[in-house]
């Protein structure tokens, strides 16, 4: 029996990257999964992957910047599966730039997506979990939400907010049987990274050059992050709440971090 057998999970941004890998892993571990995403083409592809592997899932279109759509995603999960045991607030954007390089529109969009999106989906799910007497929320933070990052003023700010929102929710709802933790990934390869590769570089050469700046000599994979999310979502972390689990290849272990 899987580690999430009998559980229902709602995952925002479950159409690609860490969200997609987590949705597939959760389903493989026995959870029924609702994938909430803006890109329904990719979400449907994730759904097909899960169903082909023998899992159970569904999809719903959701822009986490809109509170009413987050409520709709929770309601749809309840209608389809009957409960909400796990919420993985994964949807987010990663713009680069210092304060001087960041436009007001980008600043507002980052906060709306990364911070308000986490707030909205949690706010919609918490009453359900309180009524159930149990629930787990996992927020996708970042190692740059713990130490800050070069040329990532808006992103680091948003993830720092997610880190403290995680701790605050954990304190507020611990006595109601609800645990709230955050995963803090370091640099993790996702397909959109390919646009940053120089034309003359092979993918292997580029990945090798990126990894040289990390203590472990490589960047992470989405599957590695998904396994850490699974730990936080499962009963294996039953005595953990309000914690930030950093999975970054040792990048934040010392006094400096990788620069871009």
Feature locations, PLM:
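Residue(s) in the substrate-gating loop at a strand-loop-helix junction
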Residues: 142
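Active-site helix of classical SDR
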Residues: 122, 158, 166
């Amino acid at each position: 029996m899987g580690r999430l057998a009998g559980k229902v999970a709602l995952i925002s941004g479950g159409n690609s990257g860490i969200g997609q890998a987590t949705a597939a892993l959760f389903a493989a571990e026995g959870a029924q999964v609702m994938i909430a995403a803006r890109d329904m083409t990719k979400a449907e592809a994730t759904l097909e992957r899960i169903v082909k592997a023998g899992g159970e899932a569904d999809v719903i279109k959701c822009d986490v910047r809109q509170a009413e759509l987050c409520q709709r995603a929770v309601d749809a999960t309840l209608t389809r599966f009957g409960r909400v045991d796990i919420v993985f607030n994964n949807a987010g954007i990663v713009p680069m730039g210092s304060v001087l390089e960041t436009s007001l529109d980008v600043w507002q969009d980052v906060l709306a997506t990364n911070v308000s999106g986490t707030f909205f989906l949690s706010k919609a799910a918490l009453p359900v979990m309180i009524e159930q007497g149990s629930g787990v929320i996992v927020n996708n933070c970042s190692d740059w939400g713990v130490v800050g990052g070069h040329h990532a003023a808006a992103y680091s700010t948003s993830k720092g907010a997610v880190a403290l929102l995680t701790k605050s929710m954990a304190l507020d709802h611990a006595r109601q049987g609800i645990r709230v933790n955050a995963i803090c990934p370091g640099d993790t390869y996702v397909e959109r990274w390919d646009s940053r590769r120089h034309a003359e570089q092979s993918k292997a050469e580029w990945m090798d050059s990126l990894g040289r700046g990390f203590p472990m000599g490589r960047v992470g994979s989405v599957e590695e992050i998904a396994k850490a999310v699974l730990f936080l979502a499962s009963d294996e972390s039953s005595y953990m709440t309000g914690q930030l689990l950093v999975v970054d290849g040792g990048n934040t272990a010392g006094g400096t971090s990788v620069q871009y």
